[in-house]
């Protein structure tokens, strides 16, 4: 037989084997899709019940349902791994197997998996039930929503904002710190068992594509694309930052540096994530009609249901479907009035089996009007790919899912659209000034959040990678916040805090880079859909509502779910395979030009050395080695605790004896910052019940002077080795370490010898005087041979005498 015959026979056998494997895999996946849908639905319903009614019983039910789903998924994942991907030709079957072969948390031991679930549930509960109390009225303790968020959205009181900001982090962040440390370790273990470098790498895997024709995409490429696009966005952000800083100086004139970073608690919400609420303080042309339509919504008696009905109308106008009847019956669109504790953070839910819901404590504001469009965009995506197999019912990548609703928000926010739904007067006319007002409001929400998002996720990636040891989490967090975002902490935070976890997405285990990529994608999508809708004019004026052609193109992409690479899905709509920041920059170009003119005489950028508390801080330098030599001890957390306690003692003494006031200062009232390895740091003091009430530096200095020796003694140091810069040394004797016995004995003996020598000298002088009185007039030196050069030791120059002391 010829060689070609055997080659043909081998190929036929290989094809038959592949066909057999593929058919078996197809049958396996069909069974999985049927069984998974029911178990997943039960788990999702239990999770919904817990999030809308936080009780121990609902937590127990959620954990039990989740455990059943996880056990089933783990079993099916192991079975999926028996099908070699190399023998699968059908792309859809292959993508499903690839997804199912990722074991997720099921690779952990039963004990560790249970512990991880316990940690995640605990973090969610702490976040949802945490409160901060008003220092001026300790009985007034507020949840985040509603309560603290109202202060952070509306208050112009610097101190009120500060206690709310600090109280939330002290209450929630500190509780979450030990849990988050465990979470990082367990998630990293899970990721590495799934063949990823760490959990950040695992998250980035959502963007990875292995495809032909140039549609592949790597996890490392995501990092590079984010870095590159951020560099392009940075000039626009820096000018927005400079403009906002100048406006904040008008509201808080003594609290803002002309060249410094922005205090984190002044930026419109609890995290400084969105600057939207700064618009009333920063509006360029205040005499123009207000494009924030919150007042109009209130005056027209809008409620939560009206807000979501208007969002639904928008989607329907472009040819997308209505919400289901179950959506309106089962969603939680307002905070319950029956006393239930709930997770208020807005989320869209695809529970499975055609059950779609939104959970949101909606308020009648323009911001929530746009948020409703965003959340309903998620539901539209969920409904569009519902016909896909279970494992492909997801966004092309996580950023796509976030972008869909944002596309609609771009149109819904335009003055033209707001006029059509009666929230702006028909007489409202657009000119250059109203255009700048509109673009600034958009930039506060969209541009202002990009560095926040980029920096937060970069920090987490570094933490998961081990590039930031847990002993430096907060130090690096605020270093990066100052350097990248131009935002500074209003009070210093040590390593007992966990500020990142004070954000919902961090406490609840969400990847966050999706909010960065979605912003880039949404402008790419908007530009493409506006072209399809035949929009003419600047991109920021485009409203795609009522364009069924644009809706049809969008729906084609949404219905793909995860069945094709996101690079291919993106290309089908926008004509490009990767992120491109140009449409975003084009959208804001008129504003960028205006900002550069406004900032012509202002400093653009920020000085990272400035701190809001610098003026009242005292610098400390400690020299252990020079003071104690080989007996120097290590400066550690315990020593810092002792220092803070010593200052608290000094403050108590000062207020008691000088002001006749009993103030219970404790170590937590002493705030330390900028600790350096060579032992230098700054500190300031606040009153015991109010972090926003800083004690003047001069009074702290007086308190230190009163208790200087007590402070020195606590550390076995003196004024020169425990130095408070700006406070002159006292006249108290320096601390001396104990002297050993042999030195004491030696000193006594040598002292006796010296006394003896002195007595001999004195005795000799007396005898000589007697001889002088009794002698004749002869030359007293006649008997002395001067050539011998003898010296009387009693008359030697003091500098020539050497001792062993």
Curated annotation (Swiss-Prot):
Motif position, SH2-binding: 781-785
Modified residues (Phosphoserine): 783
Gene Ontology MF term list: carboxypeptidase activity; metal ion binding; metallopeptidase activity; peptidyl-dipeptidase activity; virus receptor activity
Post-translational modification: Proteolytic cleavage by ADAM17 generates a secreted form. Also cleaved by serine proteases: TMPRSS2, TMPRSS11D and HPN/TMPRSS1.
Active site location: 375, 505
Segments of this protein annotated with the region Interaction with SARS S protein: 30-41, 82-84, 90-93, 353-357
PDZ-binding, short sequence motif: residues: 803-805
Top-tier EC class: hydrolase
UniProt xrefs under PROSITE patterns: COLLECTRIN_LIKE, PEPTIDASE_M2, ZINC_PROTEASE
CDD domains the record matches: M2_ACE (cd06461)
Cofactor binding comment, as recorded: Binds 1 zinc ion per subunit. Binds 1 Cl(-) ion per subunit.
Glycosylation sites: 53, 216, 322, 546, 660, 690
Binding, chloride: 169, 477, 481
Primary location group: membrane
Binding residue positions for substrate: 273, 345-346, 515
Subcellular localization, as worded in the UniProt entry: Cell membrane; Cytoplasm; Cell projection, Cilium; Apical cell membrane
Reaction equations catalysed: angiotensin II + H2O = angiotensin-(1-7) + L-phenylalanine; angiotensin I + H2O = angiotensin-(1-9) + L-leucine
Membrane topology, as annotated: Single-pass type I membrane protein
Domain Peptidase M2: 19-607
Record flagged with keyword Zinc: yes
Stated role: Essential counter-regulatory carboxypeptidase of the renin-angiotensin hormone system that is a critical regulator of blood volume, systemic vascular resistance, and thus cardiovascular homeostasis. Converts angiotensin I to angiotensin 1-9, a nine-amino acid peptide with anti-hypertrophic effects in cardiomyocytes, and angiotensin II to angiotensin 1-7, which then acts as a beneficial vasodilator and anti-proliferation agent, counterbalancing the actions of the vasoconstrictor angiotensin II. (Microbial infection) Acts as a receptor for human coronavirus SARS.
Subunit and partners: Homodimer. Interacts with the catalytically active form of TMPRSS2. Interacts with SLC6A19; this interaction is essential for expression and function of SLC6A19 in intestine. Interacts with ITGA5:ITGB1. Probably interacts (via endocytic sorting signal motif) with AP2M1; the interaction is inhibited by phosphorylation of Tyr-781. Interacts (via PDZ-binding motif) with NHERF1 (via PDZ domains); the interaction may enhance ACE2 membrane residence.
Name by which UniProt lists this protein: Angiotensin-converting enzyme 2
Organism: Paguma larvata
